Amino acid sequence: MNKKLVLMGAGLLLTAATASAQKLVTGHVTDAQGQPVMGATVRVPGTKVITTTDANGNFKLSGVPASAKKLMVSYIGMNTATVSVAGNVQVVLKDNELGEAVVIGYGTAKKVGTVVGSVKKVGGSVVENKPATNVADALQGQVAGLNIANNSGDVGTTQNITINVRGVGSLSASSEPLIVVDGVPAGAAMLSMLGPSDIESITTLKDASATSIYGSRAANGVIYITTKKGRSNEKAQIHLSQNVGWSQLARSIGNPMSADELLDFQLENGIIYPQTYAYFKGHGANTDWQKHMFDNAAPLHTTDFSIRGGSEKTTYYVSASFLKQNGITYGSSVKRTTLRTNIETKAKDWLKFGIAQSIGFSENSANRFASTRSSNVNSPSTVAASWPRYWEPYSMKSTHQIWGTDSWGILFDPNYYVDAAPSKVENLVYNGTAFAEITPVKGLTLRSQLGLYAIGNRVKSVIMPSYAQLAGGGTGSAERQSVQSSSWTITNTAEYKFNVNDNNHFTLLVGQEGIKASYDEFTAQADGLLDDRLTNLSAGTVPAAASESNYKYEYLSFFGRADYDFKQKYYANFTVRSDASSRFGKSNRRAMFYSGGVMWDMMQEAFMRPASTWLTNLQLKASVGSTGNSSIGNYTHLSLSGNTQYGGEQASYYAQFPNSDLGWEKQIQTNVGLTASFFGKLTLDFNWYNRKTKNMLMSMPLPYTTGMSAMMKNVGEMTNRGVEVEINYDIVRTKDWYVNFHTTYSYNTNKIDKLFYGLDQWDDKGSLVSYMVGKGLNYYMPIFAGVDEQDGAPMWYKVGYSGEAGYTYNPETMTKDESQIESLYQDTGKKLFAPHHGGFGFQVSWKGLTLAADFSYVLGKYMVNNDYYLNTSSSVAAQGLNLDRDALQMWKKPGDHAILPAFKYNSQFDTHLLENSSFMRLKNLQLSYDLPTTWMQATRFFENIRITFTGRNLFTVTKFKGVDPEVDSSLTTGNYPATRQYTLGVDVTF
């Protein structure tokens, strides 16, 4: 009995001791203006005890150890505060100059709201939460003026994204923006090698005030990617993420006839004999080639791991990510591994240095018959829409043959073609930077940085000898390609910040930058392979053919920038840059670029104080400046020769005339902007811009007597003009609820101002485009007037006339003479570049449950649907291929109101193929749940666990009949379709 009493007493004492070892701490958090801060994080350093403030800025933190002396309070955009644990804690958080900072190129980052230029920052979470293999794809619709098109859903390719900022700035030089990763210029391949979870932010620089500091490479804007770094005075935080899912077709391909419909059509139009008709009818096959060619459950898997933290002087971020994804076509897949290390240390009060580097390796297997714009009969998209459904694969898979194709000389299963001609691409991409930063006196920062962007690419392609028809002659072939490229960048800057009294704040920056790049490519091929097991080049019985190419280019630049503000009310910014490029002749090698901008923060004015209860921010800004475009060939200014065979002997020929007058393409851009916030909930950004391209590089036609067809010259001028609108509205923001709506919209018009030879118009029938001074780039084609209801003949409008397609022939305005088709080309009025781009989305959160969606759209877009031509053409139908069900509406008898002419007429390349490809697409839909904080505290191990389910490209609204309306092309043929994806993920933070 005494023993039991002793044990009970000990238990009570232990319970009391435990209770006394923990306590409840309450407090209140405000900003410098005394406004409550909702969502601030309050934690006990070194423990898992954590909570957040409510809508009134109040918090209750339970389970605080009695030994705890300090609390850490943090919030995005504000300095972290460390306060004593005593009574009712009152915390005032001050703005952090770098918390909500944007990096606009060189020097220290700037606080949001003090940047004069037109820039937009997107947080890394936007990219991290979207299952895209290319980070640019996740930005669609997020930034006004940033237009992104995914041209292929093939995971076996890397260069499948088109990016433009504020329209297309050049017709011959590149219109791609400059991509910078942690201060190092990088190529588009880097976008497919970045781990989404490694990205801290992506900032788009759009106007001259923001981009002019980059000079000759920034004519088309700048996309600056900042990767995650460690945090000072924070213990290690470990993050692990696992995602699994599958991909499928985003939308059906075409509308092919069924087996019975096609057989009836072919019999009716004399394409097959009655006995053939009966033969296929009796067999009864109705193969769905789309299901045969595309996998609607192609698996994908990603794993991301990172650890970040830091001491008082050293910070670190280390990560690894792995992606494995199968394509929806047979034989296409990608495996990608990415490693990153970012380390910074403050060795002395005046010395800081660090490195940021990543290396990525990918192995891509591509379906060689699924290449974009391929009309190969074995292309998956072509098979899905064009192969007769009364064909079918043989049941004996060893034959690999397609039943019913005897008249075609026996066709094989397209998936066997992939096995017979495998192709593998290996990519190794490195991006790294090392810097040293010295602060010898207060306000002065000297920085030197060395960066390297390098790519190693290896391609291995084989045609197996076991497949005689594909290999030709019963032997195979092998091809190897190796590409190595590198770009070294060294940057030295001096930045000095100082104040003149308390009202005048200055930041002066001067710098120098040098870039040295090289490219080497080697290709070799051997024929005569005799054994599928021996596919090396040395196994070929025919001597290998080899080729090699290489080039180098260099830049040398000097630049400066001055920033000034008066009382943080009036801001001014001026930049200058001098660039020299080896891509131009000595007389035009160097160019100067300038910019200037001003901004007025009206809410700092005394007369605006009465409106401060509802108008929380109002800024006006304006800028003008110049940038350059040097994205042309490396030796375009030189005289080049080539070698060939003539009369059985080696001969030389002129490959390119000397072009010493070739100079810089310059752009002068004006921007006027307004930013306003209402009630601290609704934010509006508006920008108007005028982007003038001068000395535009154009491929100028030459007389054939010169022996050349064209020559690059600075002869053109072009203008892009537009507006951009961004709206963000926090509809509800309480302790438990958060409802947000956001939208972006941009309108851009393109106009030719000057052409070569003083011409007012230049027609390019081959490209279906007409260049007309005073107008934008429009499609140039015969205008389809419809089908004559009397005889089923196609009708076209005569030059100078236009209208809708109808059924009544008017000889004054129309013609039915197919022989005149070449003389009927005219301006269609349909724009080559869509003027309207945008996106919108919402987020609804209740406690830990969140539903978010993002849509993107393009309006006023047109593309020539060459697939529709192939699937409705009489000449193609005569070969026995399947047709679109629209062909059932061909004209048959007088009085028919048909959309296609009678079968006896050949289809022509006219506007009946020019389709409205405007679209709206649900890019991402995500449902996530964060487990309660109290659960995490109870474990004393986890900080957060989030479960997510995400859908990508869930539906598309469009009138376009082709494979995918998103493709950035004037003509579509056999494009690899977009994919819909579903992923389930778990994110754990320790």
What is each PLM-predicted segment?
Residues T227, G309-S311, F322, T341, ...:
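Residue-level signature of outer-membrane beta-barrel architecture
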Residues K831-V864:
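Glycine-rich, aromatic-lined ligand/substrate-binding cores of catalytic
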Residues S67, N671-G673:
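Glycine-centered tight-turn and secondary-structure capping sites
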Residues Q242, A320-N326, A572-S581, A622:
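Transmembrane beta-strand segments that form the barrel wall of outer-membrane beta-barrel proteins
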Residues N147-N151, S212, M603-A611, T934-A938:
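Active-site phosphate-binding and catalytic loops of NTP-dependent enzymes
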Residues S595-M599, E724-I727, L925, Y929, ...:
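Outer-membrane beta-barrel "beta-signal"
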Residues M1-R340, T345-K348, K352-G360, N431, ...:
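Short, small/polar-rich motifs associated with maturation and membrane association
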Residues G113, S232-N286, G327-S332, T338-V429, ...:
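Surface-exposed loop/interface segments of Gram-negative outer-membrane beta-barrel transport/assembly proteins
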